[in-house]
Amino acid sequence: MRVVFSSMASKSHLFGLVPLAWAFRAAGHEVRVVASPALTEDITAAGLTAVPVGTDVDLVDFMTHAGHDIIDYVRSLDFSERDPATLTWEHLLGMQTVLTPTFYALMSPDTLIEGMVSFCRKWRPDLVIWEPLTFAAPIAAAVTGTPHARLLWGPDITTRARQNFLGLLPDQPEEHREDPLAEWLTWTLEKYGGPAFDEEVVVGQWTIDPAPAAIRLDTGLKTVGMRYVDYNGPSVVPEWLHDEPERRRVCLTLGISSRENSIGQVSIEELLGAVGDVDAEIIATFDAQQLEGVANIPDNVRTVGFVPMHALLPTCAATVHHGGPGSWHTAAIHGVPQVILPDGWDTGVRAQRTQEFGAGIALPVPELTPDQLRESVKRVLDDPAHRAGAARMRDDMLAEPSPAEVVGICEELAAGRREPR
């Protein structure tokens, strides 16, 4: 088969696609990764073939264009909310109205859609696999009649939000049945001569989910579970990591997609100070810019600009992070208890469900204090229940089909959806 993978302009989102792309290639299929030019180097560094299309979407410019009010609004959304009193029509319509022109349309600009459609028309793939914020991919798949699937990187919050929205849509007066996402996708499909809009363009014809069942949201969609395989980009294991730690080790990271100088109201210096008297070796993945102005680094803290998480976390007794997909999945697949500092989007759902499963502690950022962080780290280190919960989660993830097995499942599903050419 010819298989297209596509990601928004973020290396952390791209990295989630890489292991399955490798598996398709190893099974003898032709693979192309179609994305904006900014990802070309990261794609080729992963040993994959890049097809740069469109113009770059600068995430800093995106944030500036969206504005702080929009960013703050999106961060404030509680995707774990189930109370009908909160999930009103006005609330759900507001979400669709804000997300469609910002996070959805801006991440798939016209140049990217045009490039995706043009490439798929010429190369004629048999399958398109896309991450959930790259709508250019399902648009191109629909226009060319190609089977397509989403590969998730976290709880399927956008589908849950849309299902809640669609559930209330028929109850509205006909003249007020607005659907911003369907409207954008409808006229975009028409522009390229595609079929009528269908919800498959939003959710894929099937979904591939690398998270354990305990973390997934029940959306009722056809879902293929997949064992998570960690990929952190090209990396070298530092010499000090070859040695067994002399005492318990804790990883402290805010991820690679966002190099912030604080989380909520807590600065990097306060984070480091909070873990300074924890009886453990702290490996803090902060670069020089993040450490600028930090006057005191505790004696038990080693700061490193980058270290491959798949090499570091198996040596750790716990990890503290922002709830991002790479940090979370890598810790989970290695059975490491987690202290999660969720700061918006899907991180709150991921943190809440991890705590409910017994594999860690969730500390919502707005209420975060250094004292809370210190005590939470001590709890996950000293309470065997957290280690047991993390081990159960690891076992659940290891029981999922490997990427190689998922290739076979996708072959069968694609064969059943392929249109005559």
Swiss-Prot record:
EC nos: 2.4.1.278
Pathway in which this enzyme or protein is active: Antibiotic biosynthesis; erythromycin biosynthesis
Pfam families: EryCIII-like_C, EryCIII-like_N
Signal peptide: 1-23
Catalytic activity: 3-O-alpha-L-mycarosylerythronolide B + dTDP-alpha-D-desosamine = erythromycin D + dTDP + H(+)
InterPro entries in UniProt: EryCIII-like_C, EryCIII-like_N, Glycosyl_450act, Glycosyltransferase_28, UDP_glucos_trans
UniProtKB keywords: Antibiotic biosynthesis, Glycosyltransferase, Signal, Transferase
A Gene Ontology biological process term: antibiotic biosynthetic process
GO molecular function: hexosyltransferase activity; UDP-glycosyltransferase activity
SUPFAM superfamilies: UDP-Glycosyltransferase/glycogen phosphorylase
Keyword flag Transcription regulation: no
Enzyme class: transferase
Keyword Transmembrane included in the entry's annotation: no
Family classification: Belongs to the glycosyltransferase 28 family.
Subunit structure: Heterotetramer composed of EryCII and EryCIII.
NCBIfam families hit by this protein: glycosyl_450act
Stated role: Catalyzes the conversion of alpha-L-mycarosylerythronolide B into erythromycin D in the erythromycin biosynthesis pathway.
Name the record gives this protein: 3-alpha-mycarosylerythronolide B desosaminyl transferase
